[in-house]
C-alpha cells in the first residue's frame, strides 16, 4: 500500500515537471470563453425638426383701385329734319332723322348756342337760317328752327338753281320728362307751306295733368292763313307716361283732321315742349315748334 502511494506521488511530480512546474488541478473549471460582443442597440436619434418649407407664394388679393370719375360726356342733340328739296323730291316734304349733319352743313352746339358750319362744296350755298335754343333750369335742352339753301345743278347744259328748305328739331332725348302738374306753354312754329319757306306762327299749348291731355292752338299772321286747333275733340291720354305726346290738327273751318302734331316734354318738371307738325298728305305743309311753360 505505501509502495503504490509512493508511485502515485512520484508520477504526479514527474507530470508537474514536464508541464513547467505548474500543477493544474483536474477540478478547475474550464476557462470562461468571452461572449461575442453584441452591438449596442441603436438608440433612436432625437427627432430633428424638418426644415420649414417655404409655402408657395400666394398672390396678394388685388386691391380695388380707387374709382376714377368717368370723363363727362358731351350732350348729344338728335331729332327730326323736315325737308323740301325741289331737286331730289319735287314738292314733297320728307320727314327724316337728324344727328347734326344735313349733308350740306353741320350744326354743333358751342357754349349753349347752335352753330352752322357749311360743308365744303362749290355748288351748294346757304342763303338763310334761324335757330332758337331751348333751355330749362339754365341747361340747354336742344334747338329748333330752319336753314335755307340752294344748289347749282347743270341739267341738259343749263345751270339751274334748286332750292331746299330744312326745318330742324334737335333735342337731348335723355331730358324727356312728363310734367306732374297742369301747365300752359307758349312758343313758335317754323314751317313751310306750299313752298313758302321760313314761315313763322305762334303755338299755345295746355297740359291737363288729371287727364294726361294736351290741347292748344297754332295761329299764323293775318297774311298767312295758318291756323289749327290741337286735339279739338279733347281726347284724354294723348300724353304718354314717357313724356311724349301726339295730337290731331284741324283747321277751324274743317271738321276733319288736316295733320298731326308729335313731340315731347323736356327738362325740369317738363318745362319745355318741342316737336314737329306735318300735313296729312306730307306735301302741303310741315315744320317744327318749341314752347316754354308760362
Task: Give the predicted meaning of each segment.
Residues 18-294:
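Mature soluble binding/inhibitory domains
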Residues 2-10:
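Sec-dependent signal peptide recognition
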Amino acid at each position: 500500500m505505501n509502495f503504490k502511494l509512493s508511485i502515485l506521488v512520484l508520477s504526479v511530480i514527474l507530470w508537474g515537471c514536464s508541464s513547467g512546474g505548474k500543477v493544474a488541478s483536474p477540478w478547475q473549471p474550464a476557462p470562461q470563453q468571452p461572449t461575442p460582443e453584441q452591438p449596442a442597440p441603436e438608440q433612436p436619434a432625437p427627432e430633428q425638426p424638418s426644415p420649414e418649407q417655404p409655402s408657395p407664394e400666394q398672390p396678394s388679393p388685388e386691391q380695388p383701385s380707387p374709382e376714377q370719375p368717368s370723363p363727362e360726356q358731351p350732350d348729344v342733340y338728335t331729332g327730326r329734319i323736315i325737308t323740301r328739296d325741289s331737286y331730289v323730291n319735287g314738292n314733297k316734304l320728307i320727314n327724316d332723322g337728324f344727328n347734326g349733319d344735313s349733308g350740306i352743313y353741320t350744326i354743333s352746339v358751342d357754349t349753349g348756342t347752335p352753330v352752322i358750319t357749311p360743308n365744303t362744296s362749290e355748288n351748294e350755298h346757304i342763303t338763310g337760317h334761324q335757330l332758337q335754343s331751348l333751355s330749362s333750369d339754365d341747361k340747354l335742352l336742344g334747338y329748333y328752327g330752319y336753314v335755307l339753301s340752294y344748289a347749282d345743278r347743270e341739267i341738259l347744259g343749263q345751270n339751274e338753281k334748286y332750292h331746299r328748305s330744312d326745318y330742324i328739331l334737335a333735342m337731348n332725348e335723355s331730358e324727356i320728362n312728363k310734367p306732374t302738374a297742369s301747365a300752359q306753354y307758349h312758343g313758335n312754329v317754323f314751317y313751310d307751306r306750299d313752298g313758302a319757306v321760313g314761315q313763322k306762327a305762334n303755338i299755345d299749348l295746355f297740359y291737363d295733368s288729371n287727364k294726361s291731355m294736351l290741347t292748344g292752338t297754332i295761329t299764323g299772321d293775318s297774311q298767312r292763313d295758318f291756323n289749327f286747333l290741337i286735339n279739338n275733340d279733347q281726347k284724354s291720354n294723348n300724353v304718354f307716361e314717357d313724356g311724349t305726346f301726339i295730337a290731331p290738327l284741324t283747321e277751324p273751318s274743317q271738321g276733319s283732321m288736316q295733320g298731326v302734331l308729335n313731340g315731347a316734354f323736356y327738362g325740369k318738371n317738363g318745362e319745355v315742349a318741342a316737336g314737329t307738325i306735318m300735313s296729312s298728305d306730307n306735301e302741303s305743309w310741315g315744320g317744327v315748334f318749341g314752347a316754354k311753360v308760362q
